Amino acid sequence: GKHLASYSLLPDDIQIIAVCDIRGERADQMADAYNAEASYTDYKEMLKNEKLDLVSVATPNHMHAPAAIAALQAGCHVHCEKPASLTPALVQSMVDAKNQSGKKLMIGLNNRFTNWAQLAKKWVEAGRLGEIYHAKCGWKRRRGIPGKGGWFTTKAQSGGGPLIDLGVHFLDVSNYLMGFPEPVAVSGQTYSKFADKQA
């Protein structure tokens, strides 16, 4: 619903044509709430039946690649929620579909457009911070684990927990601020155990 709410703030630029959700009742509610002409429970049917300029993919992570690729192949531009997909091979398939279609594919890495990131970018470009050669990031979440027990905490559907969900923003902003340098070396480690109880 967050994407639809944002799009509805741009009535001169965006007309919401159709809404798709595997839960039909929710699709109908969202279509009614945002004056969409149609609702669907299958994105393939939506792409077959509707003439769309842009598709916004805001599904569980494991569905990003199939939905985005289908939309690109149907001739639509695509805004896909982050992370792009679960594996580099799937992301490459998305890029290949974009290149073949001639359409645009944007991943929702919105933090680079925040005021703080834009200010930091200006400072970096002006040389106010010297040569940037290292970035260290962290994120503390005080509101618990979102969607515990649902797709968000199921690795096969989410892809790997906080690093892929939240860490991707920091990786993106760090690379953006440094001008997307070619890495010399990369190392990493993930840990995806969730506590049974919150303190």
Question: Where are the model-predicted features located?
Answer:
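N-terminal Rossmann-like dinucleotide-binding module
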Residues: G1-Y34
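Short active-site oxyanion
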Residues: I14-A18, A36, D53-V55, G161
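Conserved SAM-binding strand-loop segment of SAM-dependent methyltransferases
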Residues: A36-Y43
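Beta-strand-loop-alpha-helix segment that lines the small-molecule cofactor/substrate pocket
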Residues: L54, P60-N61, A65-R112, G127
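Short, well-ordered coil/turn residues at beta-beta hairpins
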Residues: A58-T59, L177
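Predominantly a Rossmann-like dinucleotide-binding segment in NAD(P)-dependent oxidoreductases
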Residues: N111-A199
